[in-house]
Amino acid sequence: MDKPRHDMQHTLDELLFLAGDQLVAVCQERVAALLAQPEYADPRRLERFGFKGYSQQDEDGILQEIFRRIDLGSGENARRFVEIGVGDGLENNTLYLLQQGWRGLWIDADQDRCAAIRARFAAPLAAGTLQLTQAIVNAENINGLIAAAGIKGEIDLLSIDIDGNDYHVFEALDIPGALSPRVVVIEYNARFRPPVKLVQPYDALYSWDGSDYFGASLCALHDLARRKGYVLVATNLTGVNAFFVRKDLAGAHFYPDTDTAALFNPARYRLIPGFDNGHLPGYGPYLLK
């Protein structure tokens, strides 16, 4: 590259870097302004605890606070997770936990992403602290996939994010029979505010097209979770994920489950840069102290 072109590229890179920093700063200011509103002041609410470790937005912090309030399970399945829809492994709801000594199962449909996981996470896969299943998840196979991994009974966390059949997969799971998660995280479609109850029709071969046609409304998921023995404790500030805790564990630790509308957060996807943590995600071993 000749010098004028090199200088121009360097200037462009600097401008893009500054623009990125400014976007993050603006989003962080908007997040702070939102959290200063009275409805988020109740100490039982969870939005203000949100932060991004490896999650897409603020889920890592919300989960950390949930488990602080209810404690972790005990026995052989303590600190164990199942996450359905994990991307390339570097941005999901359980990598932050894996780094802290948790163990569990990742399930994803994408062949290339699973290949990247096998390469990048070779050590925990070899040690057995992480299992990976490549499969297109549907209502018919989900129980078999989890059983084949040897996971049953109580686990601490189940996370579902497959951009379509989330409701139907959650409905099909043998809960509280074969599996009993203490906490469930599931994506909701924030297009539909309470009291709307809508669910995308089941299609085992559905593939998300990138639009807002996906999943289920918060109220529909809330009703399903109640039938399975769970209470709604939070949604995240960006309006992406809903958090449920098994009813026998919730106690008075959380905002009342009786008002879905109060716990609903609308779609604020443009706030996502506000949870940027400054570096591209990577994976490597750490020493637990």
Language model features by range: what are they?
Residues 31-37, 89, 191-195:
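Short hydrophobic/aromatic-rich motifs at helix boundaries and adjacent loops
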Residues 5-18, 44, 60-65, 165-175:
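Short charge-dense sequence patches
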Residues 24-26, 37, 61-62, 144, ...:
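A broad, low-specificity signal for short, low-complexity segments enriched in glycine/proline
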Residues 78, 83, 96, 102-103, ...:
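Conserved acidic-Pro-Pro-aromatic motif
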Residues 47, 51-148, 153, 157-160, ...:
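SAM cofactor-binding core of SAM-dependent methyltransferases
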Residues 41-45, 76, 204:
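Generic signal for short, ordered secondary-structure residues
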Residues 1-47:
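Membrane-proximal basic amphipathic "stem/tether" segments
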